[in-house]
């Protein structure tokens, strides 16, 4: 029964692995719900900032703020690449990187260079491994990242845009659609589109003019930064929800596969045990007949 003992050892090993994957599935489910709640709570802030910024931009058309310039010749582009810090989340990071690298190659074919800010260690390692130009990064962001952790890399990129060293900035991340579906997304963060600086509020028979201190332009310049930061944070929250959903699905699949493997191993064990018992009985019967 040496073979039977080996099979039992393997069954116990798979059972231990199944316990781990089941625990990871439950943890990911809990984290996904918390991240979804954080996404929901962040949206009203971003929308209010956008509305006030839009109102100010429409009433101060000669603002001269570089971050609100709409037309530039594209010579160099920036990317904010958002990935996870950890693996075991299926093809989530691979899909985002595939979309990102395709866009980088398209720009290079046009003679346009890139500068990259990586948020998340998986994207950073991928960019470094193929020699892309990473100018700043933020990794090990944790389950509840603070905006302060992102300010350094983002400020670096935004300042380069203000100095006309970068002419366009893309935001690349994994968008959360639902628990079973996440899709890689690429959006133009800068220049800010006309759809953002559009109608600042629903039409109403009443309207108000506000007095801003110290000046309307100073408030507008401040709000533009806050708006851009809120968009990036929203994308980061989206990516984290996608990560937890993908990990939950991957761990559920691993748990189910472990269960199937255990069933197959038990079947093999029972067959081998039955064969051994049959052999022993045959030997006993043969011995009795010989006597």
Swiss-Prot record:
Where in or outside the cell?
Cell inner membrane
What is the protein's known function? Produces ATP from ADP in the presence of a proton gradient across the membrane. The gamma chain is believed to be important in regulating ATPase activity and the flow of protons through the CF(0) complex.
Work out whether the entry's keyword set contains Lipid biosynthesis. Answer: no
Q: Which GO terms describe its biological process?
A: proton motive force-driven plasma membrane ATP synthesis
Alphabetized InterPro entries for the sequence: ATP_synth_F1_ATPase_gsu (IPR035968), ATP_synth_F1_gsu (IPR000131), ATP_synth_F1_gsu_CS (IPR023632)
Q: Which SUPFAM superfamilies match?
A: ATP synthase (F1-ATPase), gamma subunit
Q: What is the recorded name of this protein?
A: ATP synthase gamma chain
């Amino acid at each position: 029964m040496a073979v039977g003992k080996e099979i039992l050892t393997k069954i116990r090993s798979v059972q231990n692995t199944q316990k781990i994957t089941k625990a990871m599935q439950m943890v990911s489910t809990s984290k996904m719900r918390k991240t979804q709640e954080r996404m929901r709570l962040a949206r009203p802030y971003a929308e209010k900032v956008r509305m006030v910024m839009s109102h100010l931009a429409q009433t101060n058309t000669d603002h001269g703020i570089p971050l609100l310039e709409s037309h530039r010749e594209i010579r160099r582009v920036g990317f904010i690449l958002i990935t996870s810090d950890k693996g075991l989340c299926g093809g989530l990071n691979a899909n985002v990187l595939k979309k990102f690298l395709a866009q980088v190659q398209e720009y290079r074919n046009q003679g346009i260079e890139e500068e990259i800010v990586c948020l998340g260690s998986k994207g950073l390692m991928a960019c470094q491994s193929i020699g892309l130009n990473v100018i700043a990064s933020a990794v090990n962001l944790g389950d509840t990242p603070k905006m302060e952790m992102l300010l350094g890399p983002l400020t670096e990129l935004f300042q380069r845009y203000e100095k006309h060293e970068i002419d366009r900035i893309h935001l690349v991340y994994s968008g959360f659609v639902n628990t079973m579906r996440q899709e890689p997304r690429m959006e133009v963060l800068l220049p800010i589109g006309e759809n953002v600086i559009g109608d600042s509020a629903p039409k109403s028979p009443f309207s108000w003019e506000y007095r801003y201190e110290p000046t309307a332009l100073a408030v507008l310049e401040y709000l533009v930064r806050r708006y851009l930061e809120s968009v990036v944070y929203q994308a980061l929250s989206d990516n984290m929800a996608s990560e937890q959903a993908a990990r939950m699905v991957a761990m559920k699949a691993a748990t189910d596969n472990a269960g199937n493997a255990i069933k197959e191993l038990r079947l093999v064990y029972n067959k081998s045990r039955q064969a051994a018992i049959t052999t022993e009985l045959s030997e006993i019967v043969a011995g009795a007949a010989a006597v």
